[in-house]
Amino acid sequence: MVAMGVTAAMACASLVAAPIVAQAQSKTQANQQKDVQVIAFQQTWNTIAKECTNTYGPEGVAYVEVSPPQESIQGTQWWTSYQPVSYKLDSKLGTEAEFKNMVQQCSAAGVGIIADVVLNQTTGADVAAGDQKGVAGSEYNGSTGSYPGFATKQYPDGITAADFHSCTKNISDYTNQKEVQECRLSSMWDFNSESEKVQDIQSDYLASLWNAGVRGFRMDAVKHIHTDSVKAIKEKFAKKIGKNANDIYWIQEVIGNASEAAGIQPSNYVQNGTVTEFGFKSEMNQTFKDKIANLKGLSDRLSKDLSSDDANVFVTNWDTARNEGALTYKDGAKYQLANAFMLAYDYGTPRLLSDYKWDVNDNGAPGATATSVPDVDMDKACSTNDSDWNCEQRWTSTRGMIAFRNYVNGTKVADWQDDGGDNIAFSRGAKGFIAINNGKKDKDASYTTSLADGEYCNVYATMDCSKTVTVKGGKVETTVPAHSAIALYAGATKASHPAASAATDPSDPDVSQEEDDALPDDRSV
């Protein structure tokens, strides 16, 4: 959420490609349940609007989460978006009009918008004295705690120092709940979330997002706000839009740590909505760098803290990617395979990251200035795997696994198989089957599956069904290439799979070097 450092911009690729037509919205899948979310990190509203039409809608994505849409401090770094100076819907990612157009365009494509919402804090207090201006021109004074840009009809003076908690020290003791929820996170002014005034202003902001068409809310740094205050803000918001608070989709960022205060643990927040399950991220990082066979029983382990229905899972997000302890695009095939596992598994609601390439953790989006981020033509940027953008949402494996997940939703993991090391396989009821080889050698194996006999498309590897796997007598006799997977589902057979304009997407990362030492393995699974 918060960082300090240097920014750099990278040049955009120059090739242009037409949007890839892929399999996700075939008639065999149109009625399947959708739950996949994509985090479109630091992407402008115009960029996302077009990508909803070209990619997210056709591929069956349920929601796209956008970076904080409110006005923030100036700066090229990505984390400036997390320091609001007003709740105006004018940010470096676009204007209010562009934001509303994006929501409409995505809705027309069947994709809901989740807004990343920052309610815990404003800006850093350790700044030079004097007035500053936000990206949309709102004046504020971070040294005195004066933020007139938060003004509403009810509170025309906006936010003053009296509207923040009195504690001025930085949080250091996470065993002390009061300190965590009333002192400053990285020197930023901490809203007095118990205040009626603060709750009124913040619930007005949430209502403005709802009225713009937003249908999901990811609450940033919510462990720093007391659960009772979160509940009060949500209920005020619900009343203003005429909804039941329980009917509002609410995702809460709570990083669990057993050594911290009991009152800030994830389980305390499920009364208000779903919670991000950081334990899943840690499991992905540990197992894909060690033995993925250790993923056996993962759902049982994680469910001790959060039920599947309460958990939002991810391999990485923008924060964890820029810190230790998470897989990222820099991990090559491991990152792809971990995302495939997440989409194939039956625990939690999956969240994929669509990110840009970076060398310095603080770097903003390519081409970012202190007040704006340029629009990106993803058709152009994703026409190569050497772009400034990773284009994870367009990778062949991503497209195939979203389709897989939408088809198998509602079924449970069955037929778990592993070799104690780098190879696992499991079915999703009688609807799907996946085998993952995280090893350096090809894996020859005979797997058990609940899929019916037939010839199935390997949707992890191709979009046009040019690679198939046969199921016969409840068995899959196949070779899983090193650092790869096979993913089969009943809606994608050789006979029923719709046509695609290409076998693979040009944005696919090059993992050939990782596969150079691939050699045949045994049939021990």
Regions found by a protein language model. Give the residues of each.
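Flexible, glycine-rich active-site loops centered on histidine and acidic residues
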Residues: 127-149
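Ser/Thr/Gly/Pro-rich low-complexity, disordered linker/stalk segments of secreted
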Residues: 498-525
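Aromatic- and acidic-residue-enriched carbohydrate-binding clefts of CAZyme catalytic domains
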Residues: 31-35, 72-104, 141, 146-192
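Secretory targeting and sorting signals
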Residues: 1-23
